Amino acid sequence: MKRKDTLKDYRGKSIDQLQEVKIELLQQLFSLRMQKGTGQLKKNHLFKSAKRDIARINTIISEKNK
């Protein structure tokens, strides 16, 4: 149910708010890459989750632009 809740939350936001969330996720993804490079990252599944959330936000932004 978590995914449906986040989708409803994303769809309820404006495009500017979605852009801010996207920037936060991109920063998180960068941080994860740095942690992986230094060997500090133990939860590799967070990459996939962050990338999918970014893709979801991009999809919703493109839907709202139409």
UniProtKB/Swiss-Prot annotation:
Keyword Ribonucleoprotein attached: yes
CDD domains per record: Ribosomal_L29_HIP
Pfam name, any one: Ribosomal_L29
Highest rank taxon of the organism: Bacteria
GO terms (BP aspect): translation
Signal peptide extent: none
InterPro entries: Ribosomal_protein_uL29, Ribosomal_uL29, Ribosomal_uL29_CS, Ribosomal_uL29_sf
GO cellular component, one term: cytosolic large ribosomal subunit
Keywords per UniProt: Ribonucleoprotein, Ribosomal protein
Keyword Flavoprotein among UniProt keywords: no
GO MF annotation terms: structural constituent of ribosome
Cross-referenced HAMAP family: Ribosomal_uL29
The family this protein is said to belong to: Belongs to the universal ribosomal protein uL29 family.
Name of the protein described by the UniProt record: Large ribosomal subunit protein uL29
UniProt source species: Francisella tularensis subsp. holarctica (strain LVS)
